[in-house]
């Protein structure tokens, strides 16, 4: 019987996840199907329960349900506990396992696809919301020289930094006066077509500016290019986090490069 998987979100029609997982399944010969399900804002838990009762084997979770999925899971992986959010669920005899593959996906895209080593590099993480929290531990595991979290509300960045051990600190945008090797935009500003108030000097020589958003050019990427930085959007992260979820579910690791290339074509 074909195993069922799905991604749950609100909105969800724009999701590329069904296309990505269909490509992974073809590539690896897995008998599975994957769909996008619009969950009501007040009905996420019920939607997941219904899907599992109908034989669903696992699910991805996107905005705005990742924190709710964290609370729903019976068991959590260590990286999900650190992230405080869940983007991958697996249903088994012991209940619901919650995982978070976002940070692993980001690091895989940066170090693998983009060939940007992070060890001994200075990294600036812009934003202090859920998207930022989900990637901090995997970034710190790469042993950067320093990870700086910058946010409009400095206290939020400080509270976030206190949750983790390592070479990291928090500051406001006005305190950014030194160059970085990698600048990651984890804010929702790009969704609104806005630019975080970054000073141009954050982009060091040969710096990479990375926007977690994908699908269109953003003011952040245009600003970074105008100040000499290399740029990348979050499409590779999307595919890499999907590959990590696929591996959790199926025990097979797909080749992401052809899938990323097909989505960019």
From Swiss-Prot:
It is an enzyme of class 1 (oxidoreductase). NADP(+) binds at residues 127-131, 151-156, 212, 234. One of its GO terms (cellular component) is cytosol. The keyword Oxidoreductase applies. SUPFAM superfamilies: Aminoacid dehydrogenase-like, N-terminal domain, NAD(P)-binding Rossmann-fold domains. Its EC number is 1.1.1.25. It comes from the Bacteria. Keywords: Amino-acid biosynthesis, Aromatic amino acid biosynthesis, NADP, Oxidoreductase. HAMAP family: Shikimate_DH_AroE. Involved in the biosynthesis of the chorismate, which leads to the biosynthesis of aromatic amino acids. Catalyzes the reversible NADPH linked reduction of 3-dehydroshikimate (DHSA) to yield shikimate (SA). This is Shikimate dehydrogenase (NADP(+)). It comes from Thiobacillus denitrificans (strain ATCC 25259 / T1). The lineage of its organism: Bacteria, Pseudomonadati, Pseudomonadota, Betaproteobacteria, Nitrosomonadales.
């Amino acid at each position: 019987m074909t195993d069922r998987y799905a991604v749950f979100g609100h909105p969800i029609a724009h999701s590329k996840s069904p296309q990505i997982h269909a490509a992974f399944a073809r590539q690896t010969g897995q008998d599975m199907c994957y769909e996008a399900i619009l969950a009501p804002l007040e009905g996420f838990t019920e939607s997941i329960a219904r899907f599992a009762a109908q034989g669903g084997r696992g699910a991805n979770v996107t905005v705005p349900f990742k924190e709710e999925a964290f609370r729903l899971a019976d068991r959590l992986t260590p990286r999900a506990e650190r992230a405080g959010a869940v983007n991958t669920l697996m249903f088994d005899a012991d209940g619901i396992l919650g995982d978070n593959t976002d940070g692993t996906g980001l690091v895989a895209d940066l170090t693998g696809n983009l060939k940007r080593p992070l060890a001994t590099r200075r990294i600036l993480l812009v934003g202090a919301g859920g998207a930022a929290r989900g990637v901090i531990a995997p970034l710190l595991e790469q042993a950067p020289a320093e990870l700086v979290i910058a946010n409009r509300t400095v206290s939020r960045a400080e509270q976030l930094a206190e949750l983790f051990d390592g070479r990291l600190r928090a500051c406001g945008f006005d305190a950014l006066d030194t160059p970085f090797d990698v600048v990651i935009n984890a804010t929702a500003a790009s969704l609104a077509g806005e630019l975080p108030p970054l000073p141009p000097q954050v982009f060091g020589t040969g710096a990479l500016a990375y926007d977690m958003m994908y699908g269109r050019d953003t003011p952040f990427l245009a600003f970074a290019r105008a100040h000499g930085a290399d740029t990348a959007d979050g499409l590779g992260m999307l595919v890499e986090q999907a590959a990590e979820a696929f591996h959790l579910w199926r025990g097979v690791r797909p080749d992401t490069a052809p899938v990323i290339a097909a989505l960019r074509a």
